[in-house]
From Swiss-Prot:
Name used for this protein in its record: Uridylate kinase
Subunit structure: Homohexamer.
Annotated catalysed reactions: UMP + ATP = UDP + ADP
Gene: pyrH
Predominant place of localization: cytoplasm
Family assignment from sequence similarity: Belongs to the UMP kinase family.
Amino acid sequence: MATNAKPVYQRILLKLSGEALQGAEGFGIDASVLDRMAQEVKELVELGIQVGVVIGGGNLFRGAGLAQAGMNRVVGDHMGMLATVMNGLAMRDALHRAYVNARLMSAIPLNGVCDNYSWAEAISLLRNNRVVIFSAGTGNPFFTTDSAACLRGIEIEADVVLKATKVDGVYSADPVKNPDATLYEHITYQDVLERELKVMDLAAFTLARDHGLPIRVFNMNKPGALRRVVMGENEGTLISK
């Protein structure tokens, strides 16, 4: 596909997993990865794209393991929400150091640390070309940050949810286990459900489907991939009707 002269999206919701921030470390936040992501987001802002970001917390805290050990799931999820706030603070700082105006909002009140989530305020900031980082998931236990990404994407009327992963897109099977797995360029919501492809959890995915919110899965570790996605190039997998 020929590169478009201007971006194909006006407003996006970028979903970053917590693991994406840990780089090769295996835990925590890799400063060089954080700075690279901030630079890639900066490129989008310079193209005139309005950017909302949802970050996971898996690099700092994983509630599932502790839940198996007997910890209350609600407590574990609250800890996970706080992990996403920590990642959000790091991302906001990286963006500020890259001279990008960014605002961090949390679904749970953390006065003095970041702003409370406000739909109207978020829309206003996006229109003024501020990057808005949404943290603490949906603010409710039992909902993943993928659900938060789809929910915020729908609320801010994003053109697409861009799910940044460690793989090149959605495959017919696990490419690690099956070398013959094929990469889809485009697939419908229905096909994803029928083939039980692991794109995101069912609650998040059906929310996007019911509201006609397209999802594009791509590899954030490929330099320039995010820019190629917004310029309409064939990068990753597009999931839509």
